[in-house]
C-alpha cells in the first residue's frame, strides 16, 4: 500500500486481520493461503508480457515478486508498509524495499513491466499526477494497473480515498504521455488482478 497519511496503519491488523479489525478487506494475507492464486497471476503475466525485469509497486509482502522471480524474471518490489516488508519471503527479501509510489527511487526506463495492483485508490488525489508520472518514468514498455473504480458496499477499507472511474485513470495516463491499450487479450475472470475489466488498465509507455 502507499501514501496513507499514517503509514503505520498498514500493520499486521491491516494485512492479516483486516476484516476482524475493520481496517481492510484482507483475511490472512499469507503465502500459504493465497500463494497458489498469485502463482497463476505470475504465469499469466509472463505469458502476455514476458518481462525481463519487473517492478511491483505496492507489493505488500512481495508475493508477486516471489512468483515472478521463481519463474526466471528479474523481479523487484516496493511498498510503504514496514510490517509487510518484514514479511517478504526470504528468497526475495533483498529485492523488495520500503518506499512510496509517488517517489520511486529507480532509474528512468529501468523496468520493462511495472505493475501496480490495488494501490492507486490509496493515493491522495493531489499526488495522483506525480505517482502516475513516476510509473511511466521508470517503465520502458508497460504499466499494468488494477485499481478500485467504484464504491462497493462491502469495502470497509478507510484508506480507499481516491476512487475514480476507469476512464478517469485512463485519461490521466494519456495526459502524462501513456497510451491506453486493449485488455481483451489479458482479461481473465479466473486470474487475480485480471478478473475485473472495469479495474484493469494496460498502459504502453
Regions found by a protein language model. Give the residues of each.
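Conserved N-terminal segment of class I S-adenosyl-L-methionine
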Residues: 1-108, 115, 127-132, 149, ...
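A short beta-strand submotif of the Rossmann-like class I SAM-dependent methyltransferase core
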Residues: 113-119
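Class I S-adenosylmethionine-dependent transferase superfamily signal
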Residues: 135
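C-terminal lobe and adjacent flexible extensions of AdoMet/dcAdoMet transferase-like proteins
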Residues: 204-205
Amino acid at each position: 500500500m502507499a501514501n496513507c497519511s499514517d503509514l503505520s496503519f498498514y500493520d499486521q491488523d491491516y494485512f492479516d486481520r483486516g476484516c476482524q479489525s475493520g481496517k481492510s478487506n484482507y483475511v490472512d494475507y499469507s503465502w500459504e493461503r493465497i500463494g497458489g492464486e498469485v502463482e497463476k497471476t505470475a504465469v499469466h503475466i509472463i505469458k502476455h508480457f514476458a518481462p525481463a525485469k519487473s517492478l511491483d509497486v505496492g507489493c505488500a509482502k512481495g508475493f508477486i515478486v516471489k512468483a515472478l522471480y521463481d519463474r526466471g524474471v528479474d523481479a523487484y518490489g516496493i511498498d510503504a508498509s514496514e510490517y509487510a516488508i518484514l514479511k517478504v519471503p526470504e528468497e526475495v527479501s533483498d529485492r523488495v524495499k520500503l518506499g512510496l509510489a509517488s517517489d520511486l527511487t529507480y532509474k528512468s526506463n529501468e523496468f520493462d513491466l511495472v505493475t501496480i495492483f490495488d494501490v492507486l485508490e490509496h493515493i491522495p488525489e493531489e499526488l495522483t499526477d506525480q505517482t502516475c508520472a513516476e510509473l511511466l518514468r521508470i517503465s520502458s514498455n508497460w504499466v499494468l494497473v488494477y485499481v478500485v473504480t467504484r464504491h462497493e458496499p462491502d469495502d470497509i477499507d478507510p484508506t480507499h480515498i481516491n476512487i475514480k472511474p476507469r476512464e478517469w485513470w485512463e485519461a490521466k495516463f494519456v495526459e502524462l504521455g501513456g497510451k491506453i491499450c486493449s485488455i481483451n487479450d489479458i482479461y481473465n475472470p479466473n486470474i487475480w488482478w485480471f478478473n475485473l475489466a472495469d479495474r484493469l488498465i494496460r498502459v504502453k509507455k
